[in-house]
Amino acid sequence: MTRNKVNRRDFIKLSAVGLAVAAGTRAISEARASEAVKGEHQWAMVIDQSKCTGCGYCTLACQAHNDINPDIEWNKVSNTGEVNGKMVYLARPCMQCEHAPCVEVCPVGASYYRDDGIVMMDYDKCIGCRYCEIACPYQARSFNWEAFDGANPAVPEWGTPEVERRPRGVPEKCAFCYQRIDRGLALGMKVGVDIEATPACCVACPTGARLFGDLNDPESNVSQLLRKHTSYRLRENLGASPRVYYLPVDEAVTEEG
């Protein structure tokens, strides 16, 4: 009897996972009507791979300002190979997709859109089902199996916490340092220009590889970069429309060193 019950429970869990994946795929392709009405600002990030050195400062600043467990990374940096003898790196925050499968599969509405395009998490509402984590095509979410009760090794060297720690048993993710954006706008600052109103990862980058701004503003730094340079987004064929753009490695730059 016990064995049959365990098998049935496992079957139900596996079925739920399958449904989450299927729903995520459907959400991307159909772009359903639950998307937020677009507001005055539409935030985006541009990452220049020609400038990224893989130093990891962005990850450390993110962990400090968002008070993240050192075993979890909201911003991941990986080595993707070489171009003309120069190492190429790929930095991956949450992509803040316009058609986010994580939002579509959440059964309790804990994942949701802000009108400025940021995909948010209501950690108090989250039930820890992990459907969003499974549905995300970018592996942007990390499930915290244990409560983070200790000291944060990234504090104070890389910044001080600006948000509360998440409860145990929820999938955590980057939210473009929304707290800095909101505070900056309230104080009349220019997001993406004024340091206090810009995501911590962008501020910490020593080479200026990460830029942030408003796609609705044609004069913003991101709008100008995207007009002047060739860019790409990860897995564009899925139709999720991520808000993180990459400037590919310029071979002329790598030849110059």
Predicted ranges, named:
Residues 15, 19-26, 66, 140, ...:
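A generic secondary-structure signal for well-formed alpha-helical elements
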Residues 78, 175, 245-247:
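Residues in well-ordered beta-strands of folded domains
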